[in-house]
């Protein structure tokens, strides 16, 4: 069972309800909720919620790790095997489309980039700026350079790392994929699609609740580690803005506004991404989800 959807759409509550009713195990498919340092700011299930049904792959990775889609698929393969041996229903839930695509379509065969290449590219990114790297990428991989926004630091650096390390453009590697761990015909895949305005209001209220629940202290502890700002955990929604506040650059109110706005923009992109990249997911209104699950999984939802 795959449950996807934009952030704050009610995925976790639905997955927990299904796990309790079916004897299932909830398996995380969110790229930020894997980090143990970020329970509050990523809206990970609470300890009380985790006690109601088995949960896997939540808070298992240190924030200093650049946890890739390949690493996720490897971890998910182990979790799925263990859940199946236990005779439980695997319920994969999250909002990271790339993870779902890797699970159901297979993973591209991009080899690991040597640390010295990655470090050299990041050093030049900080020293020379993203425009210089974008121009260099155009010389090595013009297709990627044309496709990527000139200010997209992360993706430009990644594309340049791959072509420098392997001598082949990233698109070439993406054409080679491994067999999918979860073929589309073997799963029920749902995308929760709430009303946009209601979702955005919920995002705003949830971000405020996160701050009241200790998100600022959580981010302060992360900031004290002085990790590479390009690491995924350091770019989780709300983290950069709250770090700016902790440095005295902006007020807490400004940080909250930026964090909530970034999250709303991300939710909008999730709608678009799933519609175009994973059209096999069944779009369901949250209020209709129970009825849909009872139809496709009678007696288990």
Swiss-Prot record:
Q: Does the keyword Nucleotide-binding apply?
A: yes
Q: Where is this site: Interaction with substrate tRNA?
A: 96, 118
Which terms are listed as keywords in the entry?
A: ATP-binding, Magnesium, Nucleotide-binding, Transferase, tRNA processing
Under InterPro entries, the record lists: Dimethylallyltransferase, IPT, P-loop_NTPase
Q: Which residues hold ATP?
A: 5-12
Please describe the quaternary structure of this protein.
Monomer.
Family the entry assigns? Belongs to the IPP transferase family.
User: What protein am I looking at?
Assistant: tRNA dimethylallyltransferase
Q: Name the source organism.
A: Rhodopseudomonas palustris (strain TIE-1)
């Amino acid at each position: 069972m795959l449950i996807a959807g934009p952030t704050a759409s009610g995925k976790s509550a639905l997955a927990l309800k299904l796990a309790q009713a079916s004897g299932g195990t909830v398996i995380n498919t969110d790229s930020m909720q894997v980090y143990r340092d970020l329970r509050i700011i990523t809206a990970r299930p609470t300890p009380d919620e985790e006690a109601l049904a088995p949960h896997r792959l939540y808070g298992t990775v240190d924030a200093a790790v650049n946890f890739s889609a390949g690493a996720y698929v490897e971890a998910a393969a182990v979790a799925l095997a263990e859940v199946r041996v236990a005779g439980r229903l695997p319920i994969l839930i999250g909002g990271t489309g790339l993870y779902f695509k890797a699970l159901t379509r297979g993973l591209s065969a991009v080899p690991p980039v040597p640390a010295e290449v990655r470090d050299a590219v990041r050093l030049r990114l900080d020293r020379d700026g993203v425009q210089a790297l974008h121009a260099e990428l155009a010389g090595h991989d013009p297709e990627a350079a044309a496709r990527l926004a000139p200010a997209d630091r992360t993706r430009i650096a990644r594309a340049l790392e791959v072509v420098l390390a392997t001598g082949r453009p990233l698109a070439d590697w993406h054409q080679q994929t491994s067999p999918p761990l979860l073929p589309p015909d073997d799963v029920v895949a749902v995308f929760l699609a709430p009303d946009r305005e209601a979702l955005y209001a919920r995002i705003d209220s949830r971000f405020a609740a996160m701050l009241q629940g200790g998100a600022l202290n959580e981010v302060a502890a992360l900031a004290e580690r002085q990790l590479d700002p390009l690491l995924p955990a350091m770019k989780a929604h709300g983290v950069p803005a709250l770090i700016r506040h902790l440095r005295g650059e902006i007020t807490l109110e400004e940080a909250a506004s930026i964090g909530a706005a970034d999250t709303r923009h991300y939710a909008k992109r999730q709608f678009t991404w799933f519609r175009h990249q994973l059209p096999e997911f069944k779009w369901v209104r949250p209020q209709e989800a129970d009825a849909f699950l009872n139809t496709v999984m009678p007696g288990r939802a």
